[in-house]
Amino acid sequence: MRTLLAILLFPLLVQAAGEGMWQASSVGITLNHRGESMSSAPLSTRQPASGLMTLVAWRYQLIGPTPSGLRVRLCSQSRCVELEGQSGTTVAFSGIAAAEPLRFIWEVPGGGRLIPPLKVQRNEVIVNYR
């Protein structure tokens, strides 16, 4: 609960300090087979954003159970970060252009059909920059 509150309040504190932020979300994916990976739609700002990323918050929602071995990464064009949990923050994108889009990459290692399939309801990022 504290983590969620921190994620929700952090952008307001950053804006008060004169820095910028943008938020983007997309509907999720359905992954039917192990050993395949799928990408979310690119998540990017709708307004011009100059500066470099500082802190990125992420959140995703699944429909149904989490498959064993699920691997979720958040990627820019030049860097990927392994995500631990359905929400959190990272400074791993620090120094990357604030206008660069981000994508979620979903993968379940192994082979064969996923029963039930992995269903992602929603992906969301909040990018803070200066």
Curated annotation (Swiss-Prot):
It comes from the Bacteria. This is Flagellar protein FlhE. Not essential for flagellar formation and function. The keyword Coiled coil does not apply. The lineage of its organism: Bacteria, Pseudomonadati, Pseudomonadota, Gammaproteobacteria, Enterobacterales. The gene is flhE. The keyword Chaperone does not apply. GO terms for cellular component: bacterial-type flagellum. Keywords: Bacterial flagellum biogenesis, Signal. Residues 1-16 form the signal peptide.
